[in-house]
């Protein structure tokens, strides 16, 4: 908690120096996102097929400073649920289970905001900046039904036997699981299988809509992408060494969605200030 507070307060303090000659606003947001876990290994594995996964960022807060009509800075804190579900596919190309990556982050982006300079009630904007993402919850789980499954290229049956003790080798590049295997956790935050923090890039474009002299609404299409693998080094090394029955590939978070926000502006919003 102390480190999270530090990440929030230090940029705010740095921004305060410009407040005297700028306009300040703060607000809250909510968002609905399509979330992806981009994993090269899972995408190349014939046993898995990615599905469209949707999650919410139920609440977010921001503090912004507009330095003139065209540019501003905005510090945000966003609670974000994300991850992805992969279907487990057997040799008959049927769904035979699921692999679920369930993540929750506190995103702390510092955005540069480029705005339209006019005095219209509705104005366009583009935002871009670095983002620190703090993992709050992380679980990767697997449910597998009985059936025959293809052995991926580069993976041997001995490794599969370690992960699925009841599996038998069919001798033709496939293996059999004789009975359903209930949900089990593959990776967990509590076991330090995930990195606690990630560095990401965030971007958004949308509209500022003045509602009154001090209130404005924002609507944005927003995305962020992680530049580092979410798993810790020990897990990555074990995958590269072939200690798991998965194909190794880099893994990244990517989300894109629609965000709505309501903000209070200290001073008079420009569309009202220009009215006679």
Question: Which residues fall in each region the model found?
Answer:
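Outer-membrane beta-barrel translocator domains and adjoining extracellular loop/strand segments
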Residues: 38-45, 80, 85-94, 138-145, ...
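Extracellular loop and loop/strand-boundary signature of outer-membrane beta-barrel proteins
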Residues: 44-51, 93-100, 188-193, 244-250
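Glycine- and aromatic-enriched membrane insertion/assembly motifs of diderm outer-membrane
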Residues: 49-94, 106
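Outer-envelope beta-barrel architecture signal
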Residues: 22-26, 69-73, 106, 120-126, ...
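Short glycine/proline- and aromatic-enriched beta-strand/turn motifs that initiate or cap beta-hairpins
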Residues: 22-60, 194, 263-276
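Residues that define the transmembrane beta-barrel architecture of outer-membrane proteins
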Residues: 53-57, 102-108, 122, 195-201, ...
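Predominantly the C-terminal beta-signal and adjacent terminal strand-loop region
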Residues: 193-194, 198, 206, 210-276
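Residues on the lipid-exposed face of transmembrane beta-strands in outer-membrane beta-barrel proteins
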Residues: 28-32, 59-67, 108-114, 128-132, ...
């Amino acid at each position: 908690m102390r480190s999270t507070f530090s990440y929030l307060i230090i940029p705010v303090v740095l921004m305060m120096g410009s407040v005297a000659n700028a306009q300040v606003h703060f607000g809250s947001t909510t968002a609905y996102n399509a979330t992806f876990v981009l994993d090269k290994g899972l995408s190349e594995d014939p046993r898995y097929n990615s599905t469209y996964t949707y999650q919410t960022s139920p609440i977010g807060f921001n503090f912004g400073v507009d330095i003139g009509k065209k540019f501003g800075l905005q510090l945000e804190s966003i609670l974000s649920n994300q991850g992805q579900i992969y279907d487990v596919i057997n040799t008959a190309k049927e769904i035979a289970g699921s692999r679920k990556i369930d993540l929750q982050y506190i995103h702390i982006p510092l955005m540069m905001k480029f705005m339209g300079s006019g005095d219209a009630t509705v104005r366009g904007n583009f935002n871009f900046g670095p983002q620190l993402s703090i993992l709050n919850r992380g679980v990767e789980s697997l449910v597998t039904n009985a059936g025959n499954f293809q052995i991926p290229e580069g993976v041997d049956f001995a490794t599969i036997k370690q992960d699925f003790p009841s599996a038998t080798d069919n001798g033709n590049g496939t293996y059999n699981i004789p009975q359903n295997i209930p949900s089990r956790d593959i990776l967990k935050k509590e076991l330090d299988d995930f990195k606690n923090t990630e560095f990401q890039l965030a971007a958004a474009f949308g509209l500022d809509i003045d509602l009154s002299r001090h209130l404005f609404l924002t609507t944005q299409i927003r995305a962020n992408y992680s530049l580092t693998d979410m798993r810790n080094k020990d897990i990555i090394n074990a995958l590269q060494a072939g200690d798991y029955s998965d194909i190794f590939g880099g893994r990244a978070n990517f989300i894109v969605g629609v965000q709505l926000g309501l903000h209070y502006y200290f001073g008079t919003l420009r569309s009202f200030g220009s009215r006679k």
